[in-house]
Amino acid sequence: MPAELSPIDTAKFAAARRAVDLVQDGMKLGLGTGSTAAWMVRCLAERVREEGLRVQGVPTSTRTAELARALGIQVVTLDEAKWLDLTIDGADEFDADFNLIKGGGAALLQEKIVATASDRMVVIADAAKEVAHLGAFPLPVEVIPFGWQSTKMLIEETLEGMDVLGREVTLRLSGDAPLLTDEKNYILDLHLKRIGEPRKLGLALNQIAGVVENGLFIDICDTVVVGHGDGRVSLRDLQSGQAEEGFIDMDRARNIFADLGD
């Protein structure tokens, strides 16, 4: 077991641990993708193992599916589950209205499909992910490989009429080749610095031929759980306006840390 977690990993663990407390027996769950979501999967597996919690998980990526299966969580497809009680996922950024940028892990398409097929979406994040305005993190846009350069030009043209501070568009690479999503598509990263009207931008991007989906999640997230490096955690619900503060006992994490290889 590692001697001590870094403050950022402590924050991610704290958020994940608190969010998993929302899971009830018999639920069908959307399992997010990314480093914070991986903590959530481990925390969920601990409850399955120690409490006999019965859940079905719908992963949002191949790597999440592999982790969930390895830890003993029952994995099903969204077609098998049909509808979900709860999705727990991370975010690259979120604002005061719980609008999100997601897709840093290149799983934005499945993440958005799963989140919108859920009664509730809970986002888990460290405090650094909260921003006044979206856009400092590059906005991912998933595009069809065929004619991607033409699609890129249309995106750049669309950005000319948008309230953004930057307009650079780059193809995401894996080594020297384009990164491929689980659906074998490409990712274009939009370096916008600040997005003034995220709803308008999201709608405009999805009207472009060749665009599959974009990483703006608008009116999808219901609850945000924010972790801090000292183990503090806050839960905020958009609909009720309520906020809860708490503290995660890091000593309880020993059996989770034990299965970490790095």
Curated annotation (Swiss-Prot):
<feature type="binding site">
    <location>
        <position position="129"/>
    </location>
    <ligand>
        <name>substrate</name>
    </ligand>
</feature>
<comment type="pathway">
    <text>Carbohydrate degradation; pentose phosphate pathway; D-ribose 5-phosphate from D-ribulose 5-phosphate (non-oxidative stage): step 1/1.</text>
</comment>
<comment type="function">
    <text>Catalyzes the reversible conversion of ribose-5-phosphate to ribulose 5-phosphate.</text>
</comment>
<keyword id="KW-0413">Isomerase</keyword>
<feature type="active site" description="Proton acceptor">
    <location>
        <position position="111"/>
    </location>
</feature>
<dbReference type="GO" id="GO:0004751">
    <property type="term" value="F:ribose-5-phosphate isomerase activity"/>
</dbReference>
<dbReference type="GO" id="GO:0005829">
    <property type="term" value="C:cytosol"/>
</dbReference>
<dbReference type="Pfam" id="PF06026">
    <property type="entry name" value="Rib_5-P_isom_A"/>
</dbReference>
<dbReference type="GO" id="GO:0006014">
    <property type="term" value="P:D-ribose metabolic process"/>
</dbReference>
<comment type="subunit">
    <text>Homodimer.</text>
</comment>
<comment type="similarity">
    <text>Belongs to the ribose 5-phosphate isomerase family.</text>
</comment>
<dbReference type="GO" id="GO:0009052">
    <property type="term" value="P:pentose-phosphate shunt, non-oxidative branch"/>
</dbReference>
<dbReference type="InterPro" id="IPR020672">
    <property type="entry name" value="Ribose5P_isomerase_typA_subgr"/>
</dbReference>
<dbReference type="InterPro" id="IPR037171">
    <property type="entry name" value="NagB/RpiA_transferase-like"/>
</dbReference>
<protein>
    <recommendedName>
        <fullName>Ribose-5-phosphate isomerase A</fullName>
        <ecNumber>5.3.1.6</ecNumber>
    </recommendedName>
</protein>
<feature type="binding site">
    <location>
        <begin position="89"/>
        <end position="92"/>
    </location>
    <ligand>
        <name>substrate</name>
    </ligand>
</feature>
<feature type="binding site">
    <location>
        <begin position="33"/>
        <end position="36"/>
    </location>
    <ligand>
        <name>substrate</name>
    </ligand>
</feature>
<feature type="binding site">
    <location>
        <begin position="102"/>
        <end position="105"/>
    </location>
    <ligand>
        <name>substrate</name>
    </ligand>
</feature>
<dbReference type="InterPro" id="IPR004788">
    <property type="entry name" value="Ribose5P_isomerase_type_A"/>
</dbReference>
